[in-house]
Amino acid sequence: MGKVMLEVNNLKTKYVTRFHEDVYAVDGVSLKIEEGKSLGVAGESGCGKSTLALSLMGYYFAPLHYISGDIIVDGRKISGMKPDDVRKNILGNEIAYIPQAAMNALNPTQKIIRFVEDVIHAHDPKMPKKDIYDLAKERFQILGLPAEVLQKHAVELSGGMKQRTVIAISTILSPKVLIADEPSSALDVTSQKMVIKMMRDLMEKDLSNP
């Protein structure tokens, strides 16, 4: 058995609202994922796949609430942590998330390099802009994106380029665990295959260069 990178034990989360009955969105989920391995979660629309993805990051905001269970990333328990602590210490470098409809996750009025700076500065506020640019340039090129993309706005990019840009930003700190919520759902079949292959190649590169 290889090193366990993500372990979840009897995780329970639920949606709590004033006007509706509480709903357990994740009810007793347990799983283990070893280093270098992947796990797919399948189910019909509305069954809770996206909620599970959000829950696994240990990052909760109303109406979604953590109830009980353990989430352990590379031996570090993150369940029950305060949202600010998760954002500063966990998201990005320990565990990263590529959202569903990722193409809509980019503010159209902001340059791409600013998104990269925000992610990195959350963990290393003193990193010089030149170092951030060099790191971003290398990561973007791995995903087939020219360095010029960093100076563009989201509205200037095609759908496929936006998707790859979100992947590049999400993985800029080489996270130990990557959670992808249907990252290729808005793309055509050819682009879907390309994005999935790039994600796999990216994670394999990070594993070989820890």
Say what each PLM segment does:
Residues I78-A96, A122:
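ABC ATPase NBD coupling module
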Residues I172-K176:
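A short, proline-enriched helix->beta-strand linker immediately N-terminal to the Walker B motif
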Residues L178-D181:
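Catalytic Walker B motif of ABC-type/P-loop ATPase nucleotide-binding domains
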Residues K130-E148, R200:
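Conserved ABC ATPase "signature" region
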Residues Y66-K77:
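Conserved ABC transporter NBD signature motif
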Residues H153-L157, M161:
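Conserved ABC ATPase signature
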Residues G2-M5, K14-G28, Y59-H65, K82-V86, ...:
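A short, flexible loop at the N-terminus of ABC-type nucleotide-binding domains that lies
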